[in-house]
Amino acid sequence: MRPTNKRILDAAMQLLVKKGYRATTTKEIAEKANVSEATIFRNFKNKQGLVEALLSQHSSNRGSILEQTEGDLYKDLLHIGTCLLEELEHRKDIIKISFREPAMFQDVINHVTEYPQSMKQLLVDYLKTMGEKGVIQTGNEAEHADVFMSIIFGYFIHRLHLGDRVISMPQEKMLEHSTALFVKGISAD
Protein backbone atom coordinates (compact mmCIF):
# COMPACT_ATOMS: atom_id res chain seq x y z
CA MET A 1 0.00 0.00 0.00
CA ARG A 2 1.26 3.45 -0.86
CA PRO A 3 2.22 5.63 2.13
CA THR A 4 -0.30 8.30 1.08
CA ASN A 5 -3.17 5.81 1.08
CA LYS A 6 -2.06 4.45 4.44
CA ARG A 7 -2.10 7.96 5.94
CA ILE A 8 -5.57 8.56 4.50
CA LEU A 9 -6.91 5.26 5.85
CA ASP A 10 -5.33 5.82 9.27
CA ALA A 11 -6.85 9.31 9.45
CA ALA A 12 -10.23 8.01 8.30
CA MET A 13 -10.21 5.24 10.90
CA GLN A 14 -9.34 7.63 13.72
CA LEU A 15 -12.03 10.12 12.76
CA LEU A 16 -14.71 7.52 12.07
CA VAL A 17 -14.13 5.90 15.47
CA LYS A 18 -14.14 9.27 17.23
CA LYS A 19 -16.94 11.08 15.39
CA GLY A 20 -18.89 8.51 13.41
CA TYR A 21 -19.55 8.28 9.69
CA ARG A 22 -22.02 11.13 9.30
CA ALA A 23 -20.02 13.61 11.35
CA THR A 24 -16.73 12.87 9.59
CA THR A 25 -16.07 14.76 6.37
CA THR A 26 -13.62 13.95 3.62
CA LYS A 27 -12.20 17.44 4.16
CA GLU A 28 -11.34 16.55 7.79
CA ILE A 29 -9.83 13.25 6.69
CA ALA A 30 -7.72 15.06 4.08
CA GLU A 31 -6.51 17.61 6.65
CA LYS A 32 -5.61 14.93 9.18
CA ALA A 33 -3.79 12.88 6.51
CA ASN A 34 -2.08 16.00 5.15
CA VAL A 35 -3.37 15.46 1.61
CA SER A 36 -5.81 17.27 -0.63
CA GLU A 37 -9.44 16.23 -0.67
CA ALA A 38 -8.99 15.52 -4.39
CA THR A 39 -6.42 12.84 -3.49
CA ILE A 40 -9.07 11.05 -1.43
CA PHE A 41 -11.56 11.19 -4.29
CA ARG A 42 -8.95 10.06 -6.81
CA ASN A 43 -7.83 7.08 -4.69
CA PHE A 44 -11.08 6.07 -2.97
CA LYS A 45 -13.87 7.84 -4.92
CA ASN A 46 -15.83 8.81 -1.77
CA LYS A 47 -16.21 8.21 1.96
CA GLN A 48 -17.89 4.85 1.36
CA GLY A 49 -14.87 3.84 -0.72
CA LEU A 50 -12.69 4.63 2.28
CA VAL A 51 -14.81 2.38 4.49
CA GLU A 52 -14.58 -0.43 1.93
CA ALA A 53 -10.79 -0.03 1.82
CA LEU A 54 -10.67 -0.15 5.62
CA LEU A 55 -12.68 -3.38 5.59
CA SER A 56 -10.41 -4.99 3.01
CA GLN A 57 -7.44 -4.41 5.33
CA HIS A 58 -9.03 -6.64 7.96
CA SER A 59 -8.91 -10.12 6.51
CA SER A 60 -7.60 -13.03 8.51
CA ASN A 61 -6.34 -16.54 8.06
CA ARG A 62 -8.34 -18.79 10.36
CA GLY A 63 -7.24 -21.98 8.62
CA SER A 64 -3.89 -22.12 10.37
CA ILE A 65 -5.56 -22.06 13.81
CA LEU A 66 -6.65 -25.72 13.66
CA GLU A 67 -3.29 -26.74 12.26
CA GLN A 68 -1.78 -25.61 15.57
CA THR A 69 -4.04 -27.73 17.78
CA GLU A 70 -2.55 -30.69 19.66
CA GLY A 71 -5.56 -32.81 20.62
CA ASP A 72 -5.50 -31.55 24.21
CA LEU A 73 -8.93 -29.99 24.83
CA TYR A 74 -7.77 -27.35 27.32
CA LYS A 75 -4.66 -26.29 25.36
CA ASP A 76 -6.53 -26.26 22.05
CA LEU A 77 -9.47 -24.21 23.35
CA LEU A 78 -7.06 -21.83 25.06
CA HIS A 79 -5.28 -21.41 21.72
CA ILE A 80 -8.55 -20.91 19.80
CA GLY A 81 -9.84 -18.44 22.41
CA THR A 82 -6.58 -16.51 22.35
CA CYS A 83 -6.65 -16.31 18.55
CA LEU A 84 -10.26 -15.14 18.57
CA LEU A 85 -9.58 -12.46 21.18
CA GLU A 86 -6.45 -11.28 19.35
CA GLU A 87 -8.39 -11.02 16.09
CA LEU A 88 -11.19 -9.08 17.78
CA GLU A 89 -8.60 -6.75 19.27
CA HIS A 90 -7.05 -6.31 15.80
CA ARG A 91 -10.50 -5.38 14.45
CA LYS A 92 -11.64 -3.26 17.40
CA ASP A 93 -11.74 0.03 15.48
CA ILE A 94 -13.94 -1.46 12.76
CA ILE A 95 -16.15 -2.97 15.47
CA LYS A 96 -16.42 0.43 17.18
CA ILE A 97 -17.51 2.00 13.89
CA SER A 98 -20.18 -0.66 13.41
CA PHE A 99 -21.52 0.01 16.93
CA ARG A 100 -21.70 3.79 16.42
CA GLU A 101 -24.08 3.75 13.47
CA PRO A 102 -25.30 0.19 12.90
CA ALA A 103 -28.18 1.12 10.59
CA MET A 104 -25.77 2.85 8.20
CA PHE A 105 -23.18 0.15 8.18
CA GLN A 106 -24.78 -3.13 7.24
CA ASP A 107 -21.71 -3.91 5.11
CA VAL A 108 -19.45 -3.22 8.09
CA ILE A 109 -21.59 -5.38 10.36
CA ASN A 110 -21.56 -8.18 7.79
CA HIS A 111 -17.78 -7.88 7.58
CA VAL A 112 -17.40 -7.79 11.38
CA THR A 113 -19.52 -10.93 11.82
CA GLU A 114 -17.85 -12.87 9.00
CA TYR A 115 -14.77 -13.82 11.04
CA PRO A 116 -16.64 -14.87 14.21
CA GLN A 117 -19.04 -16.96 12.11
CA SER A 118 -16.16 -18.77 10.47
CA MET A 119 -14.50 -19.22 13.88
CA LYS A 120 -17.73 -20.68 15.26
CA GLN A 121 -17.81 -23.25 12.45
CA LEU A 122 -14.15 -24.07 13.07
CA LEU A 123 -14.96 -24.53 16.77
CA VAL A 124 -18.01 -26.71 16.04
CA ASP A 125 -15.90 -28.92 13.76
CA TYR A 126 -13.17 -29.18 16.39
CA LEU A 127 -15.70 -30.05 19.12
CA LYS A 128 -17.28 -32.73 16.91
CA THR A 129 -13.86 -34.29 16.45
CA MET A 130 -13.28 -34.23 20.20
CA GLY A 131 -16.73 -35.75 20.76
CA GLU A 132 -15.96 -38.57 18.33
CA LYS A 133 -12.81 -39.27 20.35
CA GLY A 134 -14.90 -39.47 23.53
CA VAL A 135 -13.26 -36.43 25.08
CA ILE A 136 -16.45 -34.34 25.39
CA GLN A 137 -20.21 -34.86 25.52
CA THR A 138 -21.63 -35.18 22.01
CA GLY A 139 -24.68 -33.68 20.36
CA ASN A 140 -24.44 -30.07 21.51
CA GLU A 141 -21.36 -28.86 19.66
CA ALA A 142 -23.00 -25.72 18.22
CA GLU A 143 -24.33 -24.76 21.65
CA HIS A 144 -20.94 -25.41 23.23
CA ALA A 145 -19.33 -23.20 20.57
CA ASP A 146 -21.89 -20.43 21.23
CA VAL A 147 -21.16 -20.51 24.97
CA PHE A 148 -17.39 -20.51 24.48
CA MET A 149 -17.55 -17.65 22.00
CA SER A 150 -19.91 -15.71 24.28
CA ILE A 151 -17.28 -15.85 27.02
CA ILE A 152 -14.65 -14.42 24.67
CA PHE A 153 -16.99 -11.83 23.14
CA GLY A 154 -18.32 -10.78 26.53
CA TYR A 155 -14.83 -10.12 27.81
CA PHE A 156 -13.85 -8.26 24.63
CA ILE A 157 -16.97 -6.05 24.54
CA HIS A 158 -16.68 -5.33 28.26
CA ARG A 159 -13.06 -4.23 27.83
CA LEU A 160 -13.95 -2.23 24.72
CA HIS A 161 -16.56 -0.18 26.56
CA LEU A 162 -15.55 -0.25 30.23
CA GLY A 163 -11.85 -1.00 30.29
CA ASP A 164 -10.97 -2.83 33.49
CA ARG A 165 -13.49 -1.03 35.71
CA VAL A 166 -15.56 -4.14 36.46
CA ILE A 167 -13.59 -7.14 35.20
CA SER A 168 -10.02 -6.44 36.22
CA MET A 169 -8.66 -9.91 35.46
CA PRO A 170 -5.82 -9.73 32.92
CA GLN A 171 -6.59 -11.21 29.51
CA GLU A 172 -4.29 -14.23 29.84
CA LYS A 173 -5.65 -15.18 33.25
CA MET A 174 -9.25 -14.70 32.10
CA LEU A 175 -8.65 -16.98 29.11
CA GLU A 176 -6.98 -19.64 31.24
CA HIS A 177 -9.65 -19.58 33.96
CA SER A 178 -12.70 -19.45 31.68
CA THR A 179 -11.27 -22.15 29.40
CA ALA A 180 -10.66 -24.43 32.40
CA LEU A 181 -14.25 -23.92 33.61
CA PHE A 182 -15.61 -24.50 30.12
CA VAL A 183 -13.58 -27.69 29.62
CA LYS A 184 -14.79 -29.00 32.98
CA GLY A 185 -18.40 -28.36 31.93
CA ILE A 186 -18.27 -30.16 28.55
CA SER A 187 -15.88 -33.01 29.35
CA ALA A 188 -17.23 -36.54 28.98
CA ASP A 189 -16.13 -37.74 32.41
UniProtKB/Swiss-Prot annotation:
Residue ranges annotated for the HTH tetR-type domain, each copy included: 2-62
Gene3D superfamilies per record: Tetracycline Repressor, domain 2
Residue spans binding DNA: 25-44
Keywords annotated in UniProt: DNA-binding, Repressor, Transcription, Transcription regulation
Pfam family, one: TetR_N
Domain of life where this protein originates: Bacteria
Keyword Transcription regulation in annotation: yes
GO molecular function: DNA-binding transcription factor activity; transcription cis-regulatory region binding
Gene Ontology BP term (one): regulation of DNA-templated transcription
InterPro entries the record matches: Homeodomain-like_sf, HTH-type_Tx_Regulator, HTH_TetR
PANTHER family linked to this entry: ACREF/ENVCD OPERON REPRESSOR-RELATED (PTHR43479), ACREF_ENVCD OPERON REPRESSOR-RELATED (PTHR43479:SF11)
This protein's name: Uncharacterized HTH-type transcriptional regulator YvkB
Originating organism: Bacillus subtilis (strain 168)
